[in-house]
Curated annotation (Swiss-Prot):
Keyword flag RNA-binding: yes
Name of the protein this chain belongs to: GTPase Era
Gene Ontology BP terms: ribosomal small subunit assembly
HAMAP family hit by this protein: GTPase_Era
Organism per entry: Bradyrhizobium sp. (strain BTAi1 / ATCC BAA-1182)
Membrane topology: Peripheral membrane protein
GO cellular component term, pick one: cytosol
Residues where GTP binds: 22-29, 69-73, 131-134
Biological role stated in the UniProt entry: An essential GTPase that binds both GDP and GTP, with rapid nucleotide exchange. Plays a role in 16S rRNA processing and 30S ribosomal subunit biogenesis and possibly also in cell cycle regulation and energy metabolism.
Gene: era
Length: 308
């Protein structure tokens, strides 16, 4: 069905890009998945999970909302950190609307205040989205909303729980009305602009985050080397997990290969659920010293390589 058929004769379609910005772990990826109604971006309790711009696509009435899940904004130290923060702000400046997410529990901490201050320079309508409202008393929420709007007057304010879904539909309807008039950019059955091989790599990276609780996840990356559709309808996927040292490789493998087997089993199951076909996943772990300084790895992640 085309956008015009979906909208009905004479109905005006709308389409626009909406960037979600905020501190790490504020719930941007969870919100994108809740709005889309399907998993298009990985979610982890660890900060800095999202590294590149991931777009989720939502149809609401006669509007197509293209959500841009940006990396969390923080004080960058490593080259990779700088690339992620630069990518986040470029996503905000390139969008039609900007949703500034705040964590209701953390309130207007230094990180949140710095983001709001910088968001003032973005020349688009800005929407305040206070997430995790189920964890905070209403009086504290109202004070937080008032303080945030005093720093930067927002076009709209929403209080939501991305995890439970409370308030998400109201936000979706508002975004549908606020994106500019125009034709749909993507087919109506498309939920993300990320290729499946990229999402598959992200899913495996998510499983690394959930299995390994030290710094290792931040010093690793995953690439899909091959994606082959077999005659029986199943998919064969080969992926490489890059780490910086041999000691890290041993951690990923685990005793007798137990850790990598568990990571692979969970990743395989989730990829199969998303694709709807059986998946044969083969994982390899390789040491690539200083991969965080390799321009090719940045291109694979969809990031611009910082020269300094």
């Amino acid at each position: 069905m085309t956008a015009e058929q979906h909208a009905g004769p004479g109905a005006e379609t709308r389409c626009g890009f909406v960037a979600l910005i905020g501190a790490p772990n504020v719930g941007k990826s969870t919100l994108v998945n809740a709005l889309v109604g399907s998993k298009v971006t990985i979610v982890s309790r660890k900060v800095q999970t999202t590294r590149a711009l991931i777009r989720g696509i939502v149809i609401e009435g006669t509007s197509q909302i293209i959500l841009v899940d940006t990396p969390g904004i923080f004080s960058p130290k490593r080259r990779l950190d700088r690339a992620m923060v630069t990518t986040a702000w470029s996503g905000a400046h390139d969008a039609d609307l900007v949703c500034v997410l705040l964590d209701a529990k953390k309130g207007l901490d230094d990180e949140a205040q710095a983001i709001i201050d910088k968001a003032a320079a973005v020349a688009h309508q800005k929407i305040l989205v206070v997430n995790k409202v189920d964890l905070v008393p209403r009086e504290k929420l109202l004070a937080l909303v008032a303080a945030a709007n005093e720093k930067l007057p927002f076009a709209r304010t929403f209080m939501i729980s991305a995890l439970s879904g409370d308030g998400v539909d109201d936000l979706k309807q508002a975004l549908a009305a606020m994106v500019p008039p125009g034709p749909f950019h993507y087919p109506e059955d498309q939920m993300s602009d990320a290729p499946m091989r990229h999402l598959a790599a992200e899913i495996t990276r998510e499983k690394i985050y959930s299995h390994l609780h030290q710094e290792l996840p931040y010093q690793s990356t995953v690439e899909t080397d091959s994606w082959t559709e077999r005659k029986d309808g199943s998919i064969r996927i080969e992926q490489t997990i890059f780490v910086e040292r041999d000691s890290q490789r041993k951690i990923v493998l685990g005793k007798g290969g137990a850790t990598i087997k568990s990571i692979g089993a969970q990743s395989r199951k989730e990829i199969a659920e998303i694709t709807g076909v059986p998946v044969h996943l083969f994982l390899f772990v390789k040491v690539r010293e200083n991969w965080g300084d390799d321009p090719d790895r940045y291109r694979e992640m969809g990031l611009e390589f910082p020269r300094e």
